[in-house]
Regions:
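Conserved Rossmann-like nucleotide-binding pocket used by diverse enzymes
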Residues: 2, 26, 52-54
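A short beta-strand-turn-helix
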Residues: 3-20
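Short acidic active-site motifs
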Residues: 10-11, 60-64, 96
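Short pre-active-site segment immediately N-terminal to redox-active cysteine/selenocysteine motifs
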Residues: 18-19, 26-29, 72
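Conserved helix-turn-beta segment immediately C-terminal to the redox Cys motif
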Residues: 18-20, 37-56
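Conserved redox-active cysteine motifs that mediate thiol-disulfide chemistry
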Residues: 25-42
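Structural micro-motif
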Residues: 62, 68-77
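Non-catalytic, surface beta->alpha helical segment in thiol-disulfide oxidoreductase systems
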Residues: 78-105
Length: 105
């Protein structure tokens, strides 16, 4: 199952899960983001049932980006029960993302 796409108005509801929620903040014009897309979808498959993997287009979520200080992308934020518990900025390695997810389980 690929990562889910969440909108700005559903963000707070999505991150409130008792399961860890990895949010990939990306943009259609961002080449590194495009390269990470398939990896993010792989993580969604590998962690299905354990972690919710979501994507948010930064061009459509200005207030969320401002709230979390997102200025560089790709930007990965990990939430648990609505609280940010991890962050990776401009990460391009699957194993680093997996380590972040594994620590949250």
């Amino acid at each position: 199952m690929p990562a889910i796409h969440i909108s700005e108005d559903k963000f707070d509801e999505a991150i409130a899960s008792d399961k860890p929620v990895l949010v990939d903040f990306w943009a259609t014009w961002c080449r590194p983001c495009q390269m990470m897309g398939p990896i993010v979808d792989e993580l969604a498959d590998e962690y299905a049932g354990q972690v919710i993997v979501a994507k948010m287009d930064v061009d459509q979520c200005n207030s969320i980006c401002a709230r979390y200080g997102i200025t560089n992308i790709p930007n990965f934020k990990l939430f648990k029960n609505g609280v940010e518990v991890g962050n990776l900025v401009e990460e391009k390695k699957k194993n680093t993302l997996k380590s972040l997810l594994d620590r949250s389980l």
